[in-house]
Regions:
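Proteins with a high burden of low-complexity, intrinsically disordered sequence enriched in S/T/G/P/A and R
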Residues: 1-3, 49, 71-73, 84-92, ...
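Metal-dependent nucleotidyltransferase catalytic core
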Residues: 1-31, 37-85
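Conserved NTP/Mg2+-binding pocket subregion across the NTase superfamily
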Residues: 48-133
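Conserved nucleotidyltransferase catalytic core and NTase-mimicking acidic/glycine-rich helix/loop elements
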Residues: 109-164
Length: 164
């Protein structure tokens, strides 16, 4: 991981590096990529998919200004479980704290909304039985969306398949 951090530091001059995913929770293996949010003073928004030492990067680079007045952290919920590995003036820790606060403040679904989610799953299951491309599409959509609906039924946020 040290070579990856050195690469990030030399290329983006980050003020914060926030690592999430398998390299954060210690479950990384030979097929893992390296997930990180990188905040930079001097770089535009960019998605870096380079390789370092055979590890594919999945770096989301953002200029600091992007987070100056955020009103919605929904695209950054995956940072909830993360490690700030480089930080200047507590910028990364403050950003993570704001994201955690945002996620923790999200309301649970109402009983009506939960029932709607179940009904949607039942409808998709029925429609997925079509023996055509639309049926296959609906089957895969059901498989992915039902994970989120299941977590909603348990009054939890869905952060991905590894974080439950």
């Amino acid at each position: 991981m040290n070579n990856i951090i050195e690469y990030i530091e030399s290329k983006y001059t980050p003020i914060a590096i926030i690592v999430y995913g398998s390299y954060c929770d210690g479950t990384n293996n030979e097929s893992s990529d390296f997930d990180a949010l990188v905040i930079s003073d001097n770089h535009v928004k960019f998605h870096d998919l380079s390789f370092v030492d055979g590890v594919q990067l999945d770096l989301f680079i953002y200029p600091k200004e992007f987070f100056d007045k955020p009103d919605d952290f929904s695209d950054f919920m995956h940072i909830y479980y993360s490690d700030v590995v480089k930080d200047t003036n507590n910028y990364g820790e403050n950003l993570k704290r704001n994201i955690v606060k945002y996620v923790d403040s999200l309301p649970n679904k109402t009983d009506v909304e939960l029932l709607e989610g179940i009904a949607w799953c039942q409808k998709m299951l029925k429609r997925s039985k079509q023996n055509d491309i639309e049926g296959m599409f609906r089957w895969h959509w059901l498989l992915t969306e039902s994970l989120s609906i299941f977590c909603q039924l348990k009054h939890k946020q869905y952060f991905g398949p590894k974080l439950q």
